[in-house]
């Protein structure tokens, strides 16, 4: 019998680059094993508890043996009806729960399976750069070619999107969008989606929008849904996850709504890949969507307090980062004295010298290499401690005087 060769290659895996975030994660764990107190802003993993009424519903329903069997790939009808009501209440949009809604095992699973179901080898997909990794590599895993569209300061993203469609050959089959953005926290207004839908119809391009941060918004701003655009469901679908709005990241539950053909495609491939998520989780999701939404406001308010402490502290250190109006992230441009290092080496330096762990922007795409991302997952006292560590690093590098705070040179 022939032995398995360790040199055997797997083409699909070979298309995936090394996961940059693993580098900083391993360094963080090594530092903690040495007894160092590392303040961790790296992963967007909510640190708060799931609201009690949702947990109680899960526990109650899980006691019923009739809920322990296989679920359905589309999700239980009651949850799909709750999703429909959620869209009506929030956005005044009618969603048919039978044909235009499907439950997913978190957005990440749904996005990956949708691309696997709809993309062929040789298809082109437009993706913002920088972007959440599954937006890029879901298409890569499916065998498609990714064309990056710069999502950077000083560049009109819609104009770049339109230019990419005109200049791509073969014509793009799909575009992946996500606003408010992870990692950049960039936001758009409804007018942007109106132009996107018109563009997609003109060039026959499918639109997939990831609305993960719909509720993590600040200062009175509201995140629009692409489904608010008349005719959007002709070309578009939208994902939402309960991970951030309800502190349910580990529960792995979300949904997709919109275009019937794409909903059917996702349902078809999920019928082969899974039997849906655990029924008690789905019933608990109904409790989340239809229960008192004060918990959602409280979660957003907590992130706002952390945002304010971090941005104020970094400004005091001379690091003039932008104040995000949504998401749970601060997208921080690397200060000029460190710019040549690139985001990975700068992240390593922050870890070593400031005891602060962040995500290097290069992990979200080449255009992210000028930035690092802070996730607002530490409490305010820990954030202040992180700022002190960063100030100490700047001071040691001669960028701050021992008594006075001086603004770092801008890039």
Name every feature range the model reports, one short phrase each.
Residues 1-9, 14-19, 26-39, 45-61, ...:
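PLP-dependent class I/II
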Residues 69-71, 297:
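Short, surface-exposed loop/turn segments at secondary-structure junctions
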Residues 75-82:
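Long amphipathic alpha-helix in the N-terminal Rossmann-like dinucleotide-binding domain
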């Amino acid at each position: 019998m022939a032995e398995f060769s360790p040199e055997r290659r797997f083409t699909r895996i070979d298309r995936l680059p090394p996961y940059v975030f693993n580098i900083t994660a391993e360094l963080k764990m090594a530092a903690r094993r040495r007894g160092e107190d590392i303040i961790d802003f790296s992963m967007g993993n909510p640190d708060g508890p799931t609201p009690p009424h949702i947990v109680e519903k899960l526990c109650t329903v899980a006691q019923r043996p009739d809920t322990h069997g296989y679920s359905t790939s589309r999700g239980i009808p009651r949850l799909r009806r709750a999703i429909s009501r959620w869209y009506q209440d929030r956005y005044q949009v009618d969603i048919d729960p039978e044909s235009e809604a499907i439950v997913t095992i978190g957005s990440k699973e749904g996005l990956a399976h949708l691309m696997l179901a709809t993309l062929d080898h040789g298809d082109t997909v437009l993706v913002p750069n920088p972007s959440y990794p599954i937006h890029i590599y879901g298409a890569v895993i499916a065998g498609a070619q990714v064309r990056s569209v710069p999502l950077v300061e000083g560049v009109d993203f819609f104009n770049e999107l339109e230019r990419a469609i005109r200049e791509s050959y073969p014509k793009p089959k799909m575009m992946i969008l996500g606003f408010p953005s992870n990692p950049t926290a960039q936001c758009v207004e409804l007018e942007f989606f109106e132009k996107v839908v018109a563009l997609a119809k003109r060039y026959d391009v499918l639109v997939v929008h990831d609305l993960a941060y719909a509720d993590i918004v600040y200062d009175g701003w509201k995140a629009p849904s692409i489904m608010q655009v008349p005719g959007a469901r002709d070309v578009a679908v939208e994902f939402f996850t309960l991970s951030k709005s309800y502190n349910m990241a580990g529960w792995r539950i979300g949904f997709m709504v919109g275009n019937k053909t794409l909903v059917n495609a996702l349902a078809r491939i999920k019928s082969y890949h899974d039997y849906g998520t655990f029924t008690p989780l789905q019933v608990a999701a109904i409790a989340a969507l239809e229960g008192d939404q004060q918990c959602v406001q409280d979660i957003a308010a907590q992130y706002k307090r952390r945002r304010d402490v971090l941005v104020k502290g970094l400004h005091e250190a001379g690091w003039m980062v932008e104040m995000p109006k949504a998401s749970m992230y601060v997208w921080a441009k690397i200060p000029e004295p460190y710019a040549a290092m690139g985001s990975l080496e700068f992240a390593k330096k922050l870890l070593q010298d400031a005891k602060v762990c962040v995500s290097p922007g290069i992990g979200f795409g080449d255009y992210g290499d000028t930035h690092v991302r802070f996730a607002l997952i530490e409490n305010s006292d820990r954030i202040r401690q992180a700022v002190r560590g960063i100030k100490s690093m700047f001071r040691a590098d001669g960028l701050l005087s021992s008594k006075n705070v001086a603004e770092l040179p801008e890039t």
